[in-house]
């Protein structure tokens, strides 16, 4: 089970980080936190001018594909996404399987104005405090990696700190947990994180079960304008796209190609 393996590795890494940077250190860092929160929900909600939104991902590697982008420079990539009209950025911070780094959030935030997502396997409130200290505006919580009570507790803690939360689901059980926990932003991941198999009909199956008023984000396997138009037509507000962009030499043009209306 790939997800279980990653979560276990995350637990081990987390224990080391807590020793190196105790909770008290993170708490003191907040006193000097220079970051003003950026409006995540506004960035992701549909408008007549921008019927759907793009969360563009800064990602070097993945467990299923290995290294995706050799010439990986997070700030340059972020600037290119801004030129292409990205509404928010997802930044991988998991170091072992995705070759991410928390510092990427801090580096990128200095140069682009859009909200930043800490994309990681968050299982502890310590990681949420880290996200705030390093400059994230919202975090990812994966329903399959958490008990319902844990999901609710972490979601409420993030909101207490002023962070928004994207709750990722892959099946009806995950969705039930997400809704019960109070998720406002629901991410439907076409990729099963236990097997890494793709299920591209998942939005069609789950969207009818989502209460009105939620922001719906589709994730994984997205590479064509036709797919985006189709999924927007059934209720998707935003699309999180990573690998497709990361494999293109010109990520600005890749973004404009997939969303021609993306010239804000």
UniProtKB/Swiss-Prot annotation:
A GO molecular function term, named singly, is: indole-3-glycerol-phosphate synthase activity
Superkingdom assignment:
Bacteria
List the catalytic activities from the record. 1-(2-carboxyphenylamino)-1-deoxy-D-ribulose 5-phosphate + H(+) = (1S,2R)-1-C-(indol-3-yl)glycerol 3-phosphate + CO2 + H2O
For this UniProt record, give its keywords in alphabetical order, as a comma-separated list: Amino-acid biosynthesis, Aromatic amino acid biosynthesis, Decarboxylase, Lyase, Tryptophan biosynthesis
Part of which pathway? Amino-acid biosynthesis; L-tryptophan biosynthesis; L-tryptophan from chorismate: step 4/5
CDD domains recorded? IGPS
Q: What is this protein called?
A: Indole-3-glycerol phosphate synthase
